[in-house]
Amino acid sequence: MNHSLASFEGGDALGFGNTNWLTLTYENDYFYITAGKEDIKVGSFEYDTYDLDSYWEMNSLFWNNCSPWQWGLSAGWYPTDGQTLILQCTNSPYSTYEVFNLFAYALAWRGEWDHYESYWSTNLWQNTKGEYVKSLNLGNRFYAGDFRFDLEYSTRTIEWSD
């Protein structure tokens, strides 16, 4: 796997290091609740791409070095057709065997229209006890016929004043 922090360097305490998705989901017309191992909700179409569908040399440093597959809970609400508001709490991608009880939190919004798709999020990833990496991610995808164009903005910091 290309992600150097992927489930503790290829393994995890439960023995599911090579498993990307293992979830149990309840869904109805208005919301869903998911528990298990899934992708961290980062508002980026690049980061949302599955490993085998990505070309290592063309990916960002963030994609290549931060594991998207973590254990946790997520809940989504469908306010209107084609839109989802998501809350998520997972293990932090900075967790290791030595420092395990670190968590990541996400608030994400996905929207789909005829020629435009959005995937925006704000995230907190705990990197040590009491310290968080904060991020704002704005993924925008535009469609014109068979052509697809992604325009994304991501910023991450320890201090908001940076």
PLM region descriptions:
Residues S4-W21, Y30-R110, W120-L124:
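Surface-exposed coil loops of outer-membrane beta-barrel proteins
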Residues L107-D162:
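Detector for outer-membrane/organellar transmembrane beta-barrel domains
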